[in-house]
Amino acid sequence: MEQKAQETILLIEKKMSQAQEVMLKNFLEIRTGYANPNILNKVNINYYGSQTPLKTLSSISVSEGTQLQIKPYEKTLIPSIKKAILASDLGITPETDGVLLRLNFPKPTEERRKVLVKEVDKLSEQTKVAVRNIRRDANDKIKKLALTKDLEALYLEKIQILTDKNMKMIEKEANNKNKELLKF
């Protein structure tokens, strides 16, 4: 029975870590005013009838900190890439010179930054809820095992320590992202 409890601890560590990774991935896609190639992760191009990620069809680089340059491996893709970027919810109009596409990222207005801060807070709160749900499920599993009261209390305490550690990490990452957004 104790082995099952230890397996439960390892499993929740993994699940909580995965929840944080998802949050951090989502944070990368939030526009801060600095050019970040990760913002294009959700942009797909219609390439020979199938939706293909932009990053597999072109090289993407940062120029001057506030500009992304997209160089397609095939020049014939430029109109399709431009169309896909315009159709996305990025709110940026690409400029092209026939070889490259350029995306200029203006600094967000104060109003837009406040909206982005709320989005960061929403994502961090969703992650906290996920971590709490993981904790609840783990506590239920531990309580169903036929452990002594002392062992049960020990494992429940370990679960709470892991939860607290993850909550602090979520708060720290959300605060860092908010500081980055409000830096301008």
Swiss-Prot record:
One Pfam entry name: RRF
Protein keywords: Cytoplasm, Protein biosynthesis
GO MF entries: ribosomal large subunit binding
UniProt xrefs under InterPro entries: Ribosome_recyc_fac, Ribosome_recyc_fac_dom, RRF_sf
A biological-process GO annotation: translational termination
Coiled-coil features, chain-numbered ranges: none
GO cellular component terms, semicolon-separated: cytoplasm
PANTHER family on file: MITOCHONDRIAL RIBOSOME RECYCLING FACTOR PSEUDO 1 (PTHR20982:SF3), RIBOSOME RECYCLING FACTOR (PTHR20982)
Similarity comment text for this entry: Belongs to the RRF family.
Protein name: Ribosome-recycling factor
Organism in which the protein naturally occurs: Phytoplasma australiense
Gene for this chain: frr
